[in-house]
From Swiss-Prot:
It is a multi-pass membrane protein. The EIIC domain forms the PTS system translocation channel and contains the specific substrate-binding site. The EIIB domain is phosphorylated by phospho-EIIA on a cysteinyl or histidyl residue, depending on the transported sugar. Then, it transfers the phosphoryl group to the sugar substrate concomitantly with the sugar uptake processed by the EIIC domain. The keyword Lipid biosynthesis does not apply. It catalyses: N(pros)-phospho-L-histidyl-[protein] + D-glucose(out) = D-glucose 6-phosphate(in) + L-histidyl-[protein]. This is PTS system glucose-specific EIICBA component. The chain crosses the membrane at residues 16-36, 73-93, 126-146, 170-190, 199-219, 273-293, 303-323, 328-348, 355-375, 383-403. Its EC number is 2.7.1.199. Its main location: membrane. The gene is ptsG.
């Protein structure tokens, strides 16, 4: 139960990163636009007072502000996409659900535009709809609901007369219904929840602010190895605290308030839950990297210099710290605990110095300049002396403990592992193999710094191999693996997903189970599209176009072109003279190659891999030659209909160079064994 919960929390944390990733672009526009309009920068650069420059600056500020003003909707869309595996249909469903929920709540509570003008009312105008203000939490709730609707109904089958609405088209319809129903309990209970949040944040921030900022920095840092820090900081950044802007609107959340105060040029009061990162990320951790380099064995210093130099520069410029932190987290957990304490003390120190700094992405030099130095609204220069003190503390504490306790930090290992050289195109294949192959992957995801994989069997994961491939660390919690590859993690995940989906086939062909049950048959380079190949019906039943198959791997022709048959009898016969190329271990899929070189995959039913061979009887074996009409497989049609998603059977030409299929009987209607199904050219 605990492991499953951790996996779910990981996915939620990663999903929150998608909308958060938009904020740096918005912050860049807003910060530069605001700085150009400010007197401080105009004093040094008088030419920017030009009317044209000022108009552009105003447009930049407005363009950046609109993102922050619509964060709840952006979170709804982003969370839906993140939790639905990146499918855009979930985002459409989230948008539909978001506007329906807000419109229904507004009408149910009889909210008028006049009510919205009262900041204390708890109402707001969202996309022009007077409604209850649910903030970012409301967006997250809708996003999660949209993802649930997608995962539940994306492959639903409906009667033929409602076939147009089957599959993904059904998701927004279902979301419209569920969000309408959700609006009523939200309208009744959310005001109480919001009052509770306000009371909690007021007590936390006003009564015990020093303790609160220390604990925030300390706990957030401790959660980073588990990837759960995004969940922890979200309410502090987007909900806790309140401030009234010049227009009379109530703004919630430390980051939202900070950005709004920067935009208006107001006196800064926000930033308490962000500013402590700057001394640590710009000074402390780079100094720790220097200590790790100095304590490395002489023969390893050249390699360590490259690793630590890159990680330190990444931390300094962007505030991305995981590549550096994971280099000592597992071998020296005491150092990481001290690092977390120092992080909390950094928040407390800047709070006591009355410094107010914020960021849109992380506490690196780029955000420091854009949102600290250029606006010049706080004592930003105090970060430098605090940071220098932190650099000294980090360097000597790390160096002393590494030597005293003989920690095996990078460059101090008893025996250096042999790094594996893998090109950019080979790396995703190598990582996939190190994870135990695609049959071992239950769920694949990534965030900015880490590859997140839920595996079926942890014993099949080659942890040292992942480190040799460039992972600075590998975290294991139950069957959830996190490999720290830094900023390239998301690209590795994307390419691994393509390989698993059969979109990239460069290595020897595998026939393994994955999330989409993708089965890839290696393409025979000798096959040529100049030949004509006749394929006869291997089943008796009703012909259906691939586009109507409720599985996007087949319907979007990721594996190749073809057709599907909804069987009326439980037999599969050879569609041509040829040879059995492969048989899937669970007997639900079979690959053949014809005497003329055409390669064909017959996939009996959808999601039938989960039946583990139950209901299937084989009559052939791999490598066996067959004649057209020979019996290949018997299957229990009733059992499949009762235990699988569908009995519909895709018949796929797996050669990408063969796309011209002539369907002699058409793509609809009944067909029998031996009838000509199509001609491939």
């Amino acid at each position: 139960m605990r492991k499953k919960l951790f996996g779910q929390l990981q996915r939620i944390g990663k999903a929150l990163m998608l909308p958060v990733a938009i904020l740096p672009a918005a912050g860049l526009l807003l910060a530069i636009g605001t700085a150009i309009q400010g007197e401080a920068l105009q004093h040094y650069l008088p030419f920017i007072q030009n009317g044209g420059v000022q108009n552009v600056a105003k447009l930049m500020t407005a363009a950046g502000s609109i993102i922050f003003e619509n964060l709840p909707m952006i979170f709804a869309l982003g969370v839906a996409i993140g939790l639905a595996g990146g499918d855009g249909v979930a985002a459409i469903a989230a948008f539909v659900g978001y506007i329906i929920m807000n419109k229904t709540m507004g009408d149910f509570l009889q909210v008028t535009p006049k009510n919205v003008t009262d900041p204390a009312s708890g109402y707001a105008s969202i996309l022009g709809i007077p409604t209850l203000q649910t903030g970012v939490f409301g967006g997250i709730i809708i996003g999660a609901l949209a993802a649930w609707c997608y995962n539940k109904f994306y492959n639903i089958n409906l009667p033929s007369y409602l076939g147009f609405f089957a599959g993904k088209r059904f998701v927004p319809i279902m979301m419209a219904t569920t969000s309408f129903i959700l609006a009523f309990p939200m309208a009744l209970i959310w005001p109480t929840i919001q009052s509770g949040l306000n009371a909690f944040s007021t007590g936390l921030l006003d009564s015990n602010t020093g303790v609160a900022v220390f604990l925030f920095g300390f706990i957030k840092r401790l959660l980073i190895p588990f990837g759960l820090h995004h969940i922890f900081h979200a309410p502090f950044w987007f909900e806790f605290g309140s401030w009234k802007n010049a227009a009379g609107e109530i703004i919630h959340g430390d980051q939202r308030i900070f950005i709004e105060q920067i935009r208006e040029g107001a006196h800064l009061t926000a930033g308490k839950f962000m500013q402590g990162e700057f001394p640590v990320m710009m000074f402390g951790l780079p100094a720790a990297a220097l200590a790790i380099y100095h304590t490395a064995k002489p023969e390893n210093k050249k390699v360590v210099a490259g690793l630590m130099g890159s990680a330190a520069l990444t931390s300094f410029l962007t505030g991305i710290t995981e590549p550096l932190e994971f280099s000592f987290l597992f071998v020296a957990p005491l150092l990481f605990f001290i690092h977390a304490v120092l992080d909390g003390l950094s928040f407390l120190t800047l709070y006591l110095l009355d410094v107010h700094l914020g960021y849109t992405f992380s506490g690196g030099f780029i955000d420091y300049v854009l949102l600290g130095v250029l606006p010049n609204k706080t004592q930003w220069w105090l970060v430098i002396p605090v940071g220098l003190v932190y650099a000294v503390i980090y360097y000597f504490v790390f160096r002393f403990l590494i030597v005293k306790l003989k920690y095996k930090t990078p460059g101090r290992e008893d025996k250096q592992s042999q790094a594996v050289t893998a090109s950019a195109t080979e790396l995703p294949y190598a990582v996939l193999e190190a994870m135990g192959g695609k049959a071992n992957i239950k769920h694949l995801d990534a965030c900015i710094t880490r590859l997140r994989v839920e595996v079926n069997d942890k014993s099949k994961v080659d942890v040292p191999g992942l480190k040799d491939l460039g992972a600075s660390g590998v975290l294991e919690v139950g069957n959830n693996m996190q490999a720290i590859f830094g900023p390239k993690s998301d690209q590795i995940k994307h390419e691994m997903q393509q390989i698993m989906n059969g979109q990239v086939v460069e290595n020897p062909t595998t026939m393994e189970d994955d999330k989409d049950e993708t089965v890839v048959v290696a393409e025979d380079k000798s096959a040529t599209s100049e030949l004509s190949h006749i394929v006869h019906a291997p089943l008796t039943g009703e012909v259906t176009p691939l586009s109507e198959v409720p599985d996007q791997v087949f319907s979007e022709k990721m594996m190749g072109d073809g057709i599907a048959i909804k069987p009326s009898q439980g037999e599969v016969r050879a569609p041509f003279n040829g040879k059995i190329q492969m048989i899937f271990p669970t007997k639900h899929a079979i690959g053949l190659v014809s005497d003329s070189g055409l390669e064909l995959l017959i996939h009996i039913g959808l999601d039938t891999v989960k039946l583990n061979g139950e209901g299937f009887t084989l009559h052939v074996e791999e490598g066996q030659e067959v004649k057209q009409g020979d019996l290949l497989i018997n299957f229990d049609l009733d059992y499949i209909r009762n235990h699988a998603k569908s009995d519909i059977t895709p018949i796929i030409v797996t050669q990408g160079n063969i796309t011209n299929l002539d369907f002699k009987q058409g793509e609809h209607g009944n067909i029998s064994f031996g009838d000509q199904l199509f001609e491939a050219k």
